[in-house]
Structures are given as C-alpha cells and as structure tokens.
C-alpha cells in the first residue's frame, strides 16, 4: 500500500521538486496540498494529480488518506505545522531549516516523539553522488586528517539562467520575520553546514 503524502505549501519548490519527486517514488502517492488560497491549492492538486487541495490545516489533517506531510511552508511556520501534524498522527518531513529557534526545534522533536510519529528534515544534498563519495573518502581516511572545510554554493547550470523569472510579487523569503531571521545562512548556508 502506498504512503499517502500531503504537501504543506504550494510554492515554486513544492511545484518543481517535491510533488514530482513524490510522483516518481514507488509506494508513495500525493494525496493533498495545502495553500492559504483555495484556488491555488486546487490548481496545484490538479497539476500534480493529487486527490485534494485544502486551504485549512484542520481539513487536511482530517483526511485519513494522508500518512505523512512534507512541510514546505515559510520557515516561521514550520513549528506550528509540524506540531499540528504530529498531534494528528501524521509523520513529518520538514523543509530546512528545521525551525527558527532551538525551543521551536525541541518542541517539534518532543511532539513527534510523544505522538509516535517520525520527524525528518529535507536535506536532499546529502544524497548527491559527489557528496556521498566525499563522505566515504573522509570516513576511510583517504584524505588524511581534515583541518579545514570550505563550502561554496552555486546556483543554476552553465548556459541556464540562475533563477526562474520573477512574478514581481514579494516572496516570503524576502521578509525577515517570515523567514525567521538568519538571511542567507537559513536559506542556503544551512545546506553547507549540514554537509559538513
């Protein structure tokens, strides 16, 4: 039986990466998506073959076909969405960063443990073949004693635009309060820290 997934957030990352990944995963099915805007939720669901679009978290969590949620909402909302989902008995995979404070991260862990559900973080770069090879080389001592690590972040590919065209609307990641502070560290640097 397939694991029923819901995506909390209907932005560009869920549209371009998360929903297609769920669709390509054996024994996984995209059941629903949550957006603050019902029309956007419905359009996302139709585009990605989900069974339902919701604009209210309580309605999504009441859907018994959903086993797990992928929290892809603004950073400041991760704790609330994770805690609600865990209390409803749903497993949680959260986008990075986990939370915007240590207290919020601890609340997420404690609530998931108390409700017997799994909590994971979406650090997909851990599974890139180059990163797995680097990890093996370090673990096997093939590179000697590591004294310094440097991380560089690149975007886009040669000959491709760095970013998708913008709509002109301000994104949540441009609002320090919604992003939860941290600026580039929370948005990109967290991947480098995770890999280290």
Language-model-derived ranges and their functions:
Residues 8-18, 61-69, 115-117:
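A broad helix-preferring feature
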């Amino acid at each position: 039986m397939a694991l029923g997934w819901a995506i909390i957030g209907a932005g560009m990352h869920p549209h371009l990466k998360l929903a297609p990944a769920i669709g390509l995963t054996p024994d996984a099915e995209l059941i629903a998506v949550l957006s603050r805007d019902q029309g956007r939720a419905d359009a996302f669901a139709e585009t990605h073959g989900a069974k339902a679009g919701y604009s209210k978290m309580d309605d999504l969590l009441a859907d018994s076909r959903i086993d797990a949620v992928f929290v892809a909402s603004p950073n400041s909302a991760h704790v609330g969405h994770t805690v609600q989902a865990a209390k409803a008995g749903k497993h949680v995979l959260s986008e990075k960063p986990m939370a915007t404070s240590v207290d919020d991260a601890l609340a997420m862990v404690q609530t998931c443990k108390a409700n017997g559900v799994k909590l994971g973080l979406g650090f997909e770069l851990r599974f890139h073949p180059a990163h797995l090879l680097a990890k093996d080389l370090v673990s096997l001592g093939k590179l000697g004693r590591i004294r310094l690590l440097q991380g560089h972040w690149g975007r886009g590919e040669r000959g491709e635009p760095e970013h998708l065209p913008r709509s002109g609307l301000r994104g949540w990641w441009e609002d320090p309060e919604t992003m939860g502070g941290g600026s580039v560290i929370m948005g990109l640097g967290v991947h480098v820290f995770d890999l280290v």
